[in-house]
Amino acid sequence: MKAKNILYLIAALLLGKSLSAQVQSTWESINERGYPQWFSDAKLGIFIHWGVYSVPAYASLEGYAEWYYRGLMTNDDRKTFQERIYGKNFQYEDFAPMWKAELWNPDEWAELFQKSGAKYVLLVSKHHDGFCLWPSQYAPKWNSVELGPKRDICGELTEAVRKKGLKMGFYYSLPEWKSDIHRWYVDPDENIGEYVDTHMIPQFKELVTRYKPTVLFTDGEWRNTAEQWHATELISWYYNTVGKDAIVNDRWGEGQQHGFRTPEYSAGITLTDRPWAECRGLGRSFGLNRNEPLENYMTSDELIRHFCVLVAAGGGMTVNVGPAADGKIPLLQQERLLDLGRWLDVNGEAIYGTRPYKKFYEMKPVKVARSEQQIDFDWKRNSPDPAISCDHFQAHWQGVFHCPADTYTFEIQTDDQARLVIDDKEVIDTQKGKTGKMKLAQGQHRIEVFYEEDDLEATIHLLWSSKTMEKQVMTNFQQGAMLPAMGLKATYTSEQPTVCYTQGKNALYAIALDYPEDQLILNIDEPAPSMKVRLLGTVKDLPWKYKDGKLFIDTSGLKYSDLRSTAAWVFQMK
């Protein structure tokens, strides 16, 4: 046996011993146990948000439909919608008996998830509204067995998923909006102790004891500490109860020190000491949002490419479906999953069980230029253009405006960094302050705005005011003194991956996100002369040469009829 294989065997034995050892309720003991390897190897899981909120299935265009009850609490447009459709006396609780799940077939779901290429499933067992999808004794008359479907959804789906050889897990909301003991977002956060002790902990243990889920994804932790949630007590108890394959996520409150990372609608993570999987919907909501436009949904090609980007950085993806109240997963969502599964049927060896290469990507600069009438944007979790990355992009606006003589107050509202320059003078740098004043003469003035988006939400608004003018968004721009076109000249730039790398035990994989018509050029170390290159899904070796620090793979001999993939093409080098 080779020395390298012996080391792998020793490491596996040590990890197995650590995972099976009794875990104490301390962060040190929990972290010493570590994480099961299966999760890092799996790469792909399915999230399911299905509940009472699936009856109204409504939110703003970018909103979370599963937060419907919170919208009623804050009197947002969901309350207006409910009163218009169901009447002023209608209550959220009245949706529960309307949730019939009359077309639900758990075996049908499990087959779809298996065909998607997923290795685990996460069902929302209880969201923040407190409604349980199992017969919880701690939610009398507010569970799926007594109301609505009249079925043990957690139990039936667990059985169906495990029959397909997939691992089953649950999402579980730590707090509740409707609890009689403590109402999340209403009662003081520091008063949550009784709720945790008498309701959350026993219900958590009831769920785990009944179904032994392999994955636990807790949520709603952010207003309290890990100590208040009794995180170490619950995690250690869960690990000791379920065993070596069990894994938890990282949402356990301030001070948590364990769990796989769960970036939400992001570009993922590039450096972490823990396993991670981005969680996201196929659209912009987790629960089904009937108000959501088609353009909010990822295309199949976008889904495949995004998944490759995450895996190349060492992570994975838990992609969400939002079934309708009748139990059917919308056909568009099914199509996306099946397309991803077909791609994995051809290219799975470059995904499952792989590790990051020493460089994740080959990057290319992307630029989009257009006119904008004003700087008044709330892209939320989107980008200004599909070609631009959702995180880490730059924007530059320039033009001219006219104004009467006055002293003006300018304001930039943004969650990131921006600068305002007028007539070559810096008026605002948001790192120093959000507002700035400038005395302007009557006439024309040059304006430039620079914006650096970091991650998550993307928002920028440019406003102005004076003693004679109320604060308002700046408008009526021109692109230059000699250019009559209205608006600002806008330029958006970012870098996007064009090739993703992964590595298996015996091969390096280059996943091309743009099809290389004649050749694929890779900036990697010089390979052994005996290396063979093959496009997955084909049988013939491709010619290659190495020159000036670059690998050139000749793809000119490939025919369209040779290709068995769309969206991304995997070149195996071994």
Where is each model-derived feature located?
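Bacterial Sec-dependent N-terminal signal peptides
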Residues: 1-23
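Generic cytosolic/nucleocytoplasmic N-terminal low-complexity/intrinsically disordered segments
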Residues: 1-4, 16, 163, 319, ...
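Composition- and surface-driven signal marking solvent-exposed, interaction-prone regions
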Residues: 2-4, 322-323, 329-335, 422-425, ...
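Generic "edge-of-domain/loop-turn" microfeature
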Residues: 20, 53, 177, 326, ...
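Mature catalytic domains of secreted/periplasmic carbohydrate-active enzymes
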Residues: 22-367, 487-574
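Acidic/polar, compositionally biased interaction segments
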Residues: 366-492
